[in-house]
Amino acid sequence: MNKIAIFGANGRMGRVLIEAIDQSQNATLNAAFVRASSSMMGVDVGELAGIGQRGLTVTDANSADFSQIDIVIDFTLPEALEANLALCVQQKKPVVIGTTGLNQQQKDALQRASQHIPIVFAANYSIGVNLLLNLARQTARVMGGTADIEIIEGHHRFKKDAPSGTAVAIGEVIADELGRDLSTCAVYGREGDTGERDQQTIGFATVRAGDIVGEHTALFADIGERIELTHKASSRLTFANGAVKAAVWLKNKSPGLYDMQDVLGLA
């Protein structure tokens, strides 16, 4: 059985991860971490996730016994990433990271840590989204030379970053396939007199409303026809189950930086 620990157990994804691991046939939850100052310290993980007591209490990572942990899953905030990575490197534990909205310094820290431990880092752990990424690359290969490309994403009102990490990941695979640099060809939102559309650009549009779990569309529009690749998530368990799958896959892997395309054999 694969023994998993969670960073950010009291967050929205942390609570769903507790439920996903509880339902898993291949993994068990051995530790759940929150900040030492959190009011959730000492709470039973099952109560935290709303699934009834499980006999494991929430604790602080710095005082934990990592000898009983095989893999760590981190869905916290960007500002917590570097400290969490340092602890995983110190303890020599593989880590699955789902934190999005990273700046360049945090991405560099991820690269450095991957020289010492195996890491899976993905903007989205849904199997369907990763199939969408694969299909977007194929569509860009065939239609990208002439089609206008737009990426539309929607999430709940509480999401703090925009566009979503998944939307950016879709843009990156399309830009890579077309030999473009997303940092120079991306257009984020439009307003006022924008002039005619530059066919070399990749447009992004963002919706933040209600309790939308996650919706992404890659639109390839040519004259006379268009293709829309859409994924809609109806439950966060979709992402949590994918992260648990990645954690099980990551155990005993060599140091390096992997993604869900590797986990699913799509790379």
UniProtKB/Swiss-Prot annotation:
Keywords tagged on the record: Amino-acid biosynthesis, Cytoplasm, Diaminopimelate biosynthesis, Lysine biosynthesis, NAD, NADP, Oxidoreductase
Annotated SUPFAM superfamilies: Glyceraldehyde-3-phosphate dehydrogenase-like, C-terminal domain, NAD(P)-binding Rossmann-fold domains
Enzyme Commission no: 1.17.1.8
Its biological purpose: Catalyzes the conversion of 4-hydroxy-tetrahydrodipicolinate (HTPA) to tetrahydrodipicolinate.
HAMAP family named in the record: DapB
Organism: Pseudoalteromonas atlantica (strain T6c / ATCC BAA-1087)
Subcellular location: Cytoplasm
Protein name: 4-hydroxy-tetrahydrodipicolinate reductase
